[in-house]
């Protein structure tokens, strides 16, 4: 009986370690904590197969706040194309699940120190081509990402709340953006919808000095007064 109990405890501990439970996958997905991420690299790069180009140079960055950024450069394309995307990530027992800002999912599987891309249903791809990303040390990409959210500025600090995910980010200091916001809010101290081309960066927190994920808003951005995320 003692052996049975010990075996049961060991099994439960193993299941807890890998985040397994008997719910459906959608219910099981939770933003992973930093402790869960520790055994994995935080950034990867590789060239993934492409149907109509030489390959897709792919860089993936996982952040401790449960978000990710991906940069994809299409090699040998007739028109140079670079696409940046972002969203939230979560772990299941055997998969890394990336959900982008439009709700679309991409799946990867940890194989040693590498990440192996899975198909659209989260299953292994049977192919002679290389679908793996290798660990690297790299900075966040500066390729602009189309974003929409509520911008609020007060006490010399700006915050952007993304419409698609509800995530909040500090905004890098931008005098022109602050002037545009002042004009758009029409004298009221309120959030205003911002449609932006932006990228993420790591910048020191003005108060603590600790590095934090910050949104850098580009010049091709605009405020839309009297609108919100529902519009």
Locations of the language-model features?
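Beta-strand/loop nucleic-acid-binding surfaces
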Residues: 167-185
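Bacterial Sec-type N-terminal signal peptides, specifically the leucine/valine-rich hydrophobic h-region
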Residues: 14-17
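Bacterial N-terminal signal peptides that target proteins for export
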Residues: 1-8
């Amino acid at each position: 009986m003692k052996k049975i109990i010990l075996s049961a405890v060991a099994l439960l501990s193993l299941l807890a370690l890998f985040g397994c439970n008997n719910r459906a996958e959608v219910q099981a997905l939770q933003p992973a904590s930093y402790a869960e991420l520790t055994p994995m690299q935080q950034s990867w790069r590789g060239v993934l197969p492409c149907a109509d180009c030489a390959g897709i140079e792919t860089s993936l960055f996982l952040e401790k706040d449960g978000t990710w950024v991906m940069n994809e450069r299409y090699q040998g394309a007739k028109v140079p194309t670079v696409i940046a995307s972002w969203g939230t990530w979560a772990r299941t027992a055997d998969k890394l699940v990336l959900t982008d800002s439009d709700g679309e999912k991409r799946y990867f599987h940890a194989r040693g120190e590498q990440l192996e891309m899975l198909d659209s249903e989260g299953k292994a791809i049977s192919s002679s081509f290389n679908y793996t990303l290798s660990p690297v040390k790299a900075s966040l990409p500066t390729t602009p990402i189309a974003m929409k959210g509520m911008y609020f500025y007060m006490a010399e600090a700006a915050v952007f709340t993304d419409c698609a995910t509800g995530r909040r980010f500090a905004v890098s200091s931008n005098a022109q953006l602050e002037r545009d916001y002042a004009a758009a809010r029409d004298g009221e101290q309120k959030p205003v919808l911002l449609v932006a081309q932006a990228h993420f960066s790591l910048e020191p927190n003005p108060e603590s000095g600790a590095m934090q994920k910050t949104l850098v808003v580009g010049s091709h951005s605009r405020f839309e007064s009297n609108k919100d995320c529902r519009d």
